[in-house]
């Protein structure tokens, strides 16, 4: 039992030391560690001497009992009899055990409190972080709120402006409605007034017709023959006359509608013809590939075109004596024929200009055949003379080599002959080089003259084609639209031709330059009056001259109306003037 008690007390002391080591403060723990570092006897003696000595054991026991009582412990430590200075072990151990249990419970409570404190600190940190996050969110929401307030303010301003605009628009709508209502009432009053006037006019017309019938002097027929169908004629009542007037008006309206439809069809056909003429004119005036046609064929075509023009002119004069429909068809056919002739003529001019422009420079720079043959013959003679001279020299040298002389004489003679021949050959070579240089110079001059002549000829052909084209276009209905562009192109041609005329007059032979400079491109006079549409149609033989025709006054008025229609329809050619220039 004693051993067990000692082991138990030692274990309890070990646990107490561990618990005290865990629960003590750092300063107390350091003091305790320093106390443990001393020997055990000295440490126990110092601790006991600090609180209890052999003299004050009863006082210490009473003090401990009081403390245990204050702590609520039932066990009390009792002292031994006075003869023995020791304690009763069982109550002391029980008190120590209870103290250890209390200490353990307090340590557990301390650990739990520490855990709770850690939890509370973690929750506090979490709450602080959440609080900071919520503060940031609050600031962000405040900023968003301020932005929303600003947008709301802007929207309110826009709403106010829109409301003001809506108010002004409503005022304008009300004003317009009032104006429309006033005008509608005015129009209704005008319509009623017109209806009343029309009714009055109808009554007046019917009255005039009735009065005219009543005032008409005629013989009354007795026992008149009945109608062929055996029916009786209706009485001449106001209703019958009104129905007949309505039928008359209906017939007049139907006639007017039929004539209007015929005029619309005629106008559509003429517009189609003019559109086709416009397309073909734009196609012709655009650059087209050249066609190889002979001069005789072109002349025969021109003669055929002129004959056809005369025939079409005669037919156009004859058509005036026919009916209106036949005259319209003939006029359309004559327009188409004249347009075909115009197209063929413009194509022919374009082909001539393209042939002149596309002519290769080798053909334009060719030397005349007679001069070329003369120069070749002269060069052949010179080459033949040189060959004969060289052959004679070779024969003489061979003869000298074949003759038998002494070595010294032969050497002297050969030396003399070779020196003389060398001098003579040098002189001949010098003359030959000089002749060659002169010949090259003459050939170069002749080639330049031929090239210049070809260029002058080509420029002459271009000026001639441009002049013919200008003269032709000045006779067409497009003269007023082509005047500015043709004047610009013509001035460019004149500016281009003046330096060429000066160079040709200074370098070319006098006969050729005079033949070229005698031609001058005519310039369009600005003071010329612009022809009218009737003059243009008469020039193109679309309509004959009034002096030559023997038509009546009705036919003349019809021709004037047709000329007005033509002048109004010819304005469609100016639609694509900027996109497709005529020059």
From Swiss-Prot:
Q: Which Pfam families does the record associate with it?
A: ADIP (PF11559)
Q: Which GO terms describe its biological process?
A: cell adhesion; intraciliary transport involved in cilium assembly
Composition bias type Basic and acidic residues, residue spans: 305-328
Going by the entry's taxonomy, the superkingdom of the source organism is recorded as Eukaryota
**Compositionally biased, Low complexity: which spans?**
504-515
**Coiled-coil stretches noted in the UniProt entry, renumbered to this chain:** 108-220, 255-333, 420-453
Outline the segment boundaries, as ranges, of region: Disordered: 285-328, 480-527
Q: Where in the cell is it found?
A: Cell junction, Adherens junction; Cytoplasm, Cytoskeleton, Microtubule organizing center, Centrosome, Centriolar satellite
- The entry's keywords: Cell adhesion, Cell junction, Coiled coil, Cytoplasm, Cytoskeleton, Microtubule
Polar residues bias located where? 484-494, 516-527
Give the main localization category.
other
Which terms in the GO cellular component ontology are assigned? adherens junction; centriolar satellite; ciliary basal body; cytoplasm; microtubule
InterPro entries referenced in this protein's UniProt entry, alphabetically: Adhesion_Centrosome_assoc, Afadin/alpha-actinin-bd
Which family is this sequence assigned to? Belongs to the ADIP family.
What is the role of the protein in this entry? Belongs to an adhesion system, which plays a role in the organization of homotypic, interneuronal and heterotypic cell-cell adherens junctions (AJs). Involved in cell movement. Acts as a centrosome maturation factor, probably by maintaining the integrity of the pericentriolar material and proper microtubule nucleation at mitotic spindle poles.
According to UniProt, the name of this protein is Afadin- and alpha-actinin-binding protein
Q: Which organism is it from?
A: Oryzias latipes
